[in-house]
UniProtKB/Swiss-Prot annotation:
NCBIfam families: csrA (TIGR00202), PRK01712.1 (NF002469)
InterPro entries: CsrA, CsrA_sf
Protein name in UniProt: Translational regulator CsrA
Locations listed in the record: Cytoplasm
UniProt family annotation: Belongs to the CsrA/RsmA family.
Keyword terms: Activator, Cytoplasm, Repressor, RNA-binding, Translation regulation
GO cellular component, one term: cytosol
Entry function: A key translational regulator that binds mRNA to regulate translation initiation and/or mRNA stability. Mediates global changes in gene expression, shifting from rapid growth to stress survival by linking envelope stress, the stringent response and the catabolite repression systems. Usually binds in the 5'-UTR; binding at or near the Shine-Dalgarno sequence prevents ribosome-binding, repressing translation, binding elsewhere in the 5'-UTR can activate translation and/or stabilize the mRNA. Its function is antagonized by small RNA(s).
Subunit relationships: Homodimer; the beta-strands of each monomer intercalate to form a hydrophobic core, while the alpha-helices form wings that extend away from the core.
Amino acid sequence: MLILTRRVGETLMIGDEVTVTVLGVKGNQVRIGVNAPKEVSVHREEIYMRIQAEKGTPAASQGNF
């Protein structure tokens, strides 16, 4: 796992087309913004796991991505 430190307003790049920007920090919550092409799905982990469970994907039951 790559671990990075970013301040509010700073961005990181994932590949050439995905950016993740720190929008704010309040207590233990961090607001981030993600810009990605339409064909790239972006979900919170709990939503992704629910989608995988509905599909019957084995990774969902094991917690593997």
